[in-house]
């Protein structure tokens, strides 16, 4: 099986199982260790993912001292903040710690609100406002409107009726003010061209219709149809302003030029119309010398159309009754009265304060709500005063800045108001002298406003707020701070007095505080207050806390801090960076870093030091410790994961070194302890999984059972633990992963041993209780063991060992890295070898259990007398049934292994049967039957093409059976065939050589014995009287063929026989290629009574056919040796056979002669 495919299959199987709820089997399996691995693996990872989602929710706010009761809280029942749905109408009590402003008496107003001035009090200001009401400008003056405004002012100023009547009459008798019309000529567009070049040289003339002789002219803008002037004019109005009309004319300036100068302009002429204009100008100049300006167009503006707040509008230019467009002019118009500037500004400041105080009291406006919109009457009075006082937009804005910042100290106003005022004030203030009165007024307002701005930064976690209100207020505050910090603070102004900003860290140093440092200090101060709040609120009594409770406290603390950071990143980071280029969450993290490191380190080290060392079982697994009372929960590891994620967050936010980055050494003892527990619990879980295993395939697509899946699930959870651990230090990482690898290998070995023991006791017999029936359980057990073994490398690869080794080489040396890699590789290989041996051992057990019936059937089937026995059929049925079970259940590799085991056991059986039946002097027919049975088995299961050691052994057994099944003469012949092969392998012989020629003919054999060489001397005189005797083997084939011999040649070691023999042979005799001719050379004694054996040689009919006719054949002479020959051993077992006995006796005599 491809290991990668196997791992993928298992992975998808696990994913499928995880999608379903735990089964009864899983409950039983996890009950023993309370789901130890699931807690540390998948469940803890899922919990981490859930926690990540929870962190994205709003954070429970920090409770303020003086916050309202439950009815003022924006919290939901689950403690999270709910966003306001009606942000425009909801009170924004976000950062208020002060009570709402109470109504004030007249005395309070005059003393705490109005500025001190030698000529200004409430009655004076009241009289001035009444006077402006009676003499308003820019709107219709009717009695009903006047009465409404008078009543409003009396209420706002809190003037008694008696005093009011007196002041009322005095205001009516005053002379009306001198009114002026303030005009700004801004620009014109698309003017009609009046010059020959297609352009004009425009300027503006303006005058009142009642006084046409008093005209005001702007500058000339040469050669343009879209001039920009931006010039101001102030026209006194002597008649009734409502009846006046302002005339605005745009003229084309015609400079005084000579005819020659005009002619020179001919190159600038544009079009036929331009040429015509130039010719006309030349003619006029030449005839009269006049240089008249030409009117482009005019506009008439009635002053009664101008509102009190002024007007900026485009007017179309006209001339006569012609409808042709002559362009348009942008003009700004405003009416004002003549008044002392300083007095007017002072009046306006006090008026704004009085109007705002009255607005806040009557409308019951909440803190941070009012954003600058007065009631209609109040707005009319304010704008009328500004108009009649001739105040510029800057004067009004600076007065508002002063008045509103003063009120803001006692009743908080919306920051949008101040932000909009700064847009008007800052561009002007930037260019003023630092010692000017306006600059002082501005910075006084800044000093009054800044404390509330920094309060916003400090109270971002306030209880009485929704996230929308926080963001809205923060945007405005940061805009305000950004605009203020761009200004240069005068040396005489201290905007951060210690009496107000006691929380600034610069108070304890010589550093100069500025807006930027104050912002960071405000953030840190608020963060410190928040941290102190959650630290005190989360911790139980230190004296009664257990280790687990201490860790839960750390988890809760980090989660709340992380939640605060999450909200900072989600809601505030973009705002801070966009507004003031500050990384808000990085500032928070750096503050939290040192504080959390101090808190967490002491707790974690204390908890880890309380851990007791465990007694881990050795590789013999003789006992498994009881861990019922020694069970570290997931809490410590959960703390590690939370800290790891927290540090990763910090590294992404901050470039500075972090104290918490070195948190992992605190957990070394805890991780070691967990790994010790994990191996013990893994072994116990594996044992229980095997006990619960029914040894049935988990489904139809696989061939392994539940215990294999359960074991790999343990590995999977351990892998998840390691990936979650992600130990950063390379040496420690190697130590831990090496232990994990070793533990996984030990688990695999333990599984193989326990699974083997489980199935060894399973014995299913047939109906007669004689034969072992190979059940599916045995096959599943083998598959389980092999599946675990094949899965091990894949799991170990998932631990990223190669990456750790690579990092180790970079940290240390490549040599050390290679040594470490070799160590891990050896551990894995040893485990795989041990598992393989365990599988082979189990396969051998199966084969040994199948051996008795196989032996019995083989023995019964080989009996000569049991010809009608069906033992052979029974044997084949037994094997087919067993092999069918194996084939259907085992995978291909294990099926091949068990086949090898069966045939290996079969070789042992055959050896035993052969040996035992040889001892019993069984006839050759017995061995013939046995051989036939073996051959049938091999043919049936197609074993002939397999090249394994066991098949070679069976082939050897088959050869022995064929040998033992031969008759005695055939055995003797077999022995001589062996001698022939031995003869051919000899290069020389001490007994000499024999030379012949031989040829098979149609009728027989033509044999010519030629000579012999170097015969071994047999006589004392060193000579020999030799002759050659030729016989045919096997004797059973050549009974009718006589033996031939040569004449005796005396006293010669090189006899020349040269004798020819014609021997008749049948066709059958000639066709047998393995037939032999045995040549025996003997020495005849002196008296011719007996002959002494010298040596012999052999040649087969096959060799004769292969030799060309007439070619001499030289054969080495040899003496037969009584060696360890299979043929001789077979003959030795036939002691009751006379032919065998005589042959062996003869052979021994020749061998030792």
UniProtKB/Swiss-Prot annotation:
Which CDD domains does this entry report, sorted A to Z? C2B_Munc13-like
One of the entry's Gene Ontology molecular-function terms is: metal ion binding
Sequence positions that bind Ca(2+) 1 = 195, 201, 252-254
Among Pfam families, the record links this protein to: C2 (PF00168)
Q: Which InterPro entries match?
A: C2_dom, C2_domain_sf, Munc13_1, Munc13_dom-2, UNC-13_domain
The record places domain MHD1 at 637-755
Q: What is this protein called?
A: Protein unc-13 homolog 4B
Provenance organism: Drosophila melanogaster
